[in-house]
Amino acid sequence: MDPEGGAPAPSQQRLDGVAEYETAIDTVIASAQRNLRIFDRSLSREYNSPRRYDLLRDFLLASRVNRVQIVVHEPDGIHRDCPRLVNLLKQFSHALAIHRTQPRARRVYDPFLLADDVSYVHRFHYDQPRGVLALGDLNGGQELLGRYEEIWEASDPALSATTLGL
């Protein structure tokens, strides 16, 4: 706790493996109160796990103002590998958006998930499992928020809640 009895002091934990990284993502999702911003090259199959599905669904059900924004370089496998996430998109189309980066943003290589602009999981490169879990880090969160807003602006909708066809 801080000296004035407010919010807990910021904490950081080094992550050295994929399992630690995936567990850290679940930790940050569970801590979210208002918004989740996710950037990655592509989404791992963990986004189809029952645990992650429940965490995201509970977050979206907690308040109608809660939002999840996802930007990926490669969204093509989401329908195939993450049908639970696609179901969430259909159920919460007003609160969940999945975008694809435009070519000008494809050189961004460090995935991160940001919750409420203060807690995050940040990998240093998408080909490496090393990263950091930070809770209550306003400064680091604001830096990632600025980067996320730039990535979001350089992206277009990738998946729709509806299926169009003939």
Regions found by a protein language model. Name each.
Residues 1-37, 41-166:
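PLD/PLD-like phosphodiesterase catalytic module centered on the HKD motif
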